[in-house]
Amino acid sequence: MLGPLPDGRAVEHESWRAINRAAVAKMVSELAYEEAFQPAPLDRHETRWELRLASGVTYRFDAMRRIWGQLTVRPESLVRLAEGRELPVDDAVAFLADARETLRISPPTFCTYARELYNTLMADARILAARTDLSAGDLAALPDTELQRLLDGHPKAPASKGRLGWGLQDFAAYAPEFGGTIRLFWLAAARDRCRLSLAPDVGEESLLAAALDETEIERLKAACAEAGVSFRTHLLLPVHPWQWQGMLAAQFASEVAAGRLVPLGAFGDPFVPQQSLRTLANTRRADALHVKLPITILNTSAWRGVPGKYMDVGPVFSRWLAGCARHDPALQPLRVLEEVAGAFYPHPHYEHVPDAPYQFCEMLGVIWRESPDAHLSDGRRPMMMGALPQRDASGRPIVSALIARSGLGHAEWLDRLFGAVAVPLYHFMCRYGVGFIAHGQNVTVILDGAIPVGVAIKDFQGDADLVDQAFPELETLPEHVRKTLKRRPPAHLLQHLQTGQFASVLRFLSEALADHDGLDETVFYATLAGRLRRYQAEHPELSERFALFDLFRPKVPRIAINRVRFAIGYGDAGERPLPDLGTDLDNPLHIAETAHSSRATARSLLSGASL
């Protein structure tokens, strides 16, 4: 391959410049939002901005301040002023170098972050080429697995496709934007070394059948027989082919030599990677189980392994969540994508080292999870919620195309969306004391045509917490699950919804609709506030819980995921890095509700004066 473009072509000059401009615009916007630096307006209308850096370089650009406080930066307006010269901006790493002193980035951290940024730009070049001729309407019509190939990625992380550990050939083979398929590599693993957890109605044969047809199952069993593997002593584990080549073949060589792990080869249906890289979907059977597999690469702030500590409780916890959803009328729009099985094989030595870097303890495991397609009736389809703000080459977002196709107005369509997504997530918190980190990858919107009618949620191992209070509703959750999951104060669970869903998904959705459709963001958040207030009015029995989990406070936490990387660098650690906190944000729900109330009061006064 000569480069990442279709047919293996190298990156072209003009597209490279455009990709870099977009990356600089994103860095300026998100790092200013995180208070890593402070651009200043140059005019009273706050349309032209200036960023002065400690290096002596100044950047100027056009931008619009949004309701969350971030700036929507126009990439084509960016200019760099240095040594009396004004030049257009077309180098994202050069911007990072200019800002390094201001951002307090050490030289080692700068170089490694630049590696992540270059990898991201390479992936973005591929995405831009693949998406060039597709309108927002075209994108909206694609099946979810195909659409995920064409998305920009994490909206808050400029280096969202860092994938440290992969080269161009690995990107081409395993990254979603390249459109390739993956066949699972299989190991036979000694049962006395492997932790297996199954839902009550799930057997090992059904797990095999979700990834292999009958012919492939027979081939795999023949390979086991040839290797002398007994199913009495060993179980079959799928692994990501890169993980076998890049990590397991060497790091677990002693287990292979002892016969506790037996490599069998690649078998089964073709799978495609989703946005998270680790989760793979079956291309032949959309309703077949997805598999989540460790890939020991650094991507979007963390090593992408699969921890073993939640493996034993995954099927039980997700089954309990699904039961709550089935029997609670307020949760009817919600479907839990159950983790029907999990297996984990600990490393014989790393596992026993106190405070060992976490990536060495998460190398070999698998989670089998339901596909969103398994829950769908005719005419309904899934769409990753993070796809809604995605824009086409003209700047039109997918959400605009869906609203136009639905025949509904903006407010009515958004009311349907919030009723399908925000209300069930909030109800789970208030009724059951469960808080989900509901970011754009973990939440799947269910569409009936172009209208939101439901939501599917996933990833409960580390992305769901329980309230630290004695909610009676939690007593039906088995004790060993309650002891394993983290217990958090109400404010922390509330932050999961405010940060994971509102500030990480809705912030960009309202920005896209304001930017392209001209929808006032106060209308957007007044619609959300109105839908949540209607839900609260329907459940007066939860009034004390609503006070405990108050979404309408004037201020909300500001979470910073980028500046924490600049501060801590890339050294090994026993746990994943935690985000940093900035000054509190003005809560858009409070802003919108207050503005709506003020307008209603003004209308009432005017009406009274006219009588």
Predicted features along the sequence, with ranges:
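Intrinsically disordered, low-complexity segments enriched in polar/charged residues with Gly/Pro
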Residues: A266, C430-G433
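An amphipathic, hydrophobic-aromatic interaction surface with interspersed Lys/Arg
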Residues: G419-R431
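A short glycine-rich, hydrophobically flanked beta-strand micro-motif that places a catalytic Asp/Glu
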Residues: Y432-I446
